[in-house]
Every structure is written in structure tokens, then in C-alpha cells.
């Protein structure tokens, strides 16, 4: 298994699919990385040479991925909560942030139903 950005990449899958195991790299970005390095997207990781894996590692290193990206997203959410803006309040209360209805639905965000006390 190749190790890129601190993640074990599966050897038996195509390069594009294997790169998506890295947090912050989706299908589109994986295709861009393959195009920039000249690596065949349909080739399996086990068939790549060490130089090609190093090229992929260097190209992925140009992006914010894994722990840094998680930290960045959490800091942005925390900043919204500290500002006390509408989006921050919704995050703080554990409700949908992007304008979805909450009278019905939104069970994932709100958690399990709480019984009404009488």
C-alpha cells in the first residue's frame, strides 16, 4: 500500500479512485492531479513506479488535505459561532444551517425525537 498525505492508498484500485481515499480529494481533484503529473488515471497504484508515486505525493501536497483541512473547516465553524451570526447560532443549536425546513424532517441534524413532557 502506498502512503500519500498520511493515508494508506489501496493498491488494487485505479489511481483516480485510490486518491479519493484522501480527505479533501474527490473525483474531480483526483483527475486534475493525475493530469498534472501525467499518471494514467486507469492504472492501478501497484503498477505505478516509485517516481510516479512521488509525483502524486508532491501534487497532493500542494492542496490542503486531511488534518489541516479538517482543522480549517472546524475553525471556520467556530468563528461563525463566536460571531453569533445566524449560521453560527444554527451550528450552536444543532439545527440545519442552509435554510432547510425543520417542522418536519431534519431528524439527522436534530437527533432522535424527545418525548413531550406533560
UniProtKB/Swiss-Prot annotation:
Q: Where is this region: Disordered?
A: 94-118
Give the CC-aspect GO terms: cytosol; small ribosomal subunit
Q: Which Pfam families match?
A: Ribosomal_S13
Q: Which GO terms describe its biological process?
A: translation
Show the stretches that span the lipid bilayer: none
Molecular functions per Gene Ontology: rRNA binding; structural constituent of ribosome; tRNA binding
Which superkingdom heads the taxonomic lineage of this protein's source?
Bacteria
Write the record's keywords in alphabetical order, separated by commas: Ribonucleoprotein, Ribosomal protein, RNA-binding, rRNA-binding, tRNA-binding
Record's subunit section = Part of the 30S ribosomal subunit. Forms a loose heterodimer with protein S19. Forms two bridges to the 50S subunit in the 70S ribosome.
Q: What is stated as this protein's family in its record?
A: Belongs to the universal ribosomal protein uS13 family.
Q: Which NCBIfam families match?
A: uS13_bact (TIGR03631)
- Role: Located at the top of the head of the 30S subunit, it contacts several helices of the 16S rRNA. In the 70S ribosome it contacts the 23S rRNA (bridge B1a) and protein L5 of the 50S subunit (bridge B1b), connecting the 2 subunits; these bridges are implicated in subunit movement. Contacts the tRNAs in the A and P-sites.
Q: What is this protein called?
A: Small ribosomal subunit protein uS13
Organism the protein comes from: Stutzerimonas stutzeri (strain A1501) (Pseudomonas stutzeri)
Gene assigned in the entry: rpsM
Amino acid at each position: 500500500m502506498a502512503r500519500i498525505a498520511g493515508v494508506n492508498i489501496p493498491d488494487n484500485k485505479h489511481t483516480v479512485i485510490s486518491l479519493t481515499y484522501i480527505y479533501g480529494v474527490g473525483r474531480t481533484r483526483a483527475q486534475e492531479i493525475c493530469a498534472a503529473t501525467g499518471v494514467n488515471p486507469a492504472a492501478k497504484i501497484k503498477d505505478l513506479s516509485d517516481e510516479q508515486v512521488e509525483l502524486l505525493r508532491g501534487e497532493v501536497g500542494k492542496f490542503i488535505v486531511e488534518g489541516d483541512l479538517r482543522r480549517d473547516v472546524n475553525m471556520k465553524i467556530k468563528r461563525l459561532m463566536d460571531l453569533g451570526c445566524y449560521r453560527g447560532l444554527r451550528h450552536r443549536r444543532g439545527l440545519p444551517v442552509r435554510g432547510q425546513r425543520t417542522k418536519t424532517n431534519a431528524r439527522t441534524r436534530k437527533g432522535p425525537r424527545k418525548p413531550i413532557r406533560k
